[in-house]
Every structure is written in C-alpha cells, then in structure tokens.
Amino acid sequence: MISINERAQESASLIKLYVMGAVMQEIQNGNLEMNDTTKHLLDEMITVSDNSATNELVRYLNKDHDHKKGMKKVNAFIKAQGFEYTHEYNGLEDTSLWYDADTKNTTSAKDCGRLLERIYRGEFISHLASRQMEELLLNQQVTYKIPSTIPSESRVANKTGETSDCENDAAIVYTPKGDYILCIMSCEVSSKSSAVDSLQEMSSLIYSYFMNRDTSKVSRQVEATAKETD
C-alpha cells in the first residue's frame, strides 16, 4: 500500500463505509436482523449516499434507538478494527445530531484503503458480509469521480464524500489486467471543480498504468523474490 500525506481529514460521506461495517458487525453478532428495512437503509446510505438513512442505521445500533449511543458503537467498532484516523463526532445533515459542531467527522485515505482491501479479500466481518458490502459499492450511483474515467470493460465499487470544500472518493477498480484500490481525499479546496478535475485525472493515469504496465516483468520480479525467500 502506498500512502501520501497520510493524516486525518474531513470524511464527509466516507464515514458511511464505517457505519456500514458497524451495522454488518451487529448483524453478524445476531444483534440486528438483515430484513427488508435494514437492506433498504444500507442501499440508500451507500448507493445514493442518503444522510437520513445513515442516521437511522446509527440509531439501530442502540437498543433504545438512541443516535448518540449508536454513534459510540460505531466508534468502538472503528477502534476495534484498527482504523487509526477515523472517528464519527456528529450525525449527518440533521443539526440536532451535531454533538460537537466545531469538529468534523474524520478518516484517512489509508484507513479507507485498508477497509476496501479487506472487503475485496472477503475478510471484513465475514466473507458473506464482505460480498454484501462489495455488492452495495458496485451499485453506486455517484460515479462522477474515480469511475468517470474508467472504461466500461472494467468495474468500479466506490463510495464518495463531498462537502462545500471537500471532494473524496474511495474505490476498488476491477480491470482485465489486475485489480487495485484507489482512495483520494481533497479537502479545504478553493475550487471544487478543479479538485474533481484533478481527481479524475489521477484516476485516469493510474488506470492507464495498470492497463499498460509490463505484467511479464512484474511476474518475473515476483518469481525472483519467491526464489530468494525459499
């Protein structure tokens, strides 16, 4: 994993990746049921980034339907999973759920990348949960950032995040020549359109690298390394 300028940044809707994980953990533990309502809320939270659905799922994490207590469960899950730069301080959009209005929810590109890698490998919560989360991300409707420059021959499973001065995206990209994970966060930007342009350009360059790289050379390097470690 390559990480550049690793630090906590405003998560915007990337925090929903961790809410999704916390909900799936509670389902795995038998404390929540994967019923039609839960499925609908998860779908709304991930595929169209609905804030009300997110707040409701956080409430579901507490037996009394208390959002603040549910949020503590999200943060306990985040800590237990080892995501160093991620924390949910406030609910989304609804100001009555802002408990620390001067502090923004945070994550990092590396934390998001590690989460997506574990989903990709089938190791996040469980293999079944990983596949369910991957399917939600593959059905993403907000695709104007990383996916926008990816040809139709490849698939993208992504989750975006945006505020008045943030443009974030975290994605698994599946290509004919190898899959990769790309997470880009740009916050405190003066021009959102320029930030999106830069994000799209980076996505295009990285995709081109993966499609045009000398895979035979990579294979030879892997084989040589394997022999050295025998």
Annotate the PLM regions:
Residues 8-32, 45, 182:
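Active-site SXXK
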Residues 114-144, 155, 165-230:
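Structured C-terminal helix/loop/strand segments within mature extracytoplasmic catalytic/sensor domains
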Residues 46-49, 57-61, 83, 89-93, ...:
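Active-site-proximal beta-strand/loop segments in catalytic clefts of secreted hydrolases
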Residues 34, 106, 150, 163-165, ...:
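Extracellular/periplasmic catalytic domains that process cell-envelope and extracellular macromolecules
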Residues 25-43, 126-130:
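Short, well-structured active-site flanking segments
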Residues 35-54, 59-63, 93-96, 220-225:
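Acidic helix-start/capping segments at beta-turn-to-alpha-helix junctions
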Residues 54-121:
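Mid-domain, small-residue-enriched loop/turn segments at the edges of structured enzyme/sensor domains
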Residues 20-29, 46-51, 58-63, 75, ...:
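Sec-exported extracytoplasmic/periplasmic mature domains
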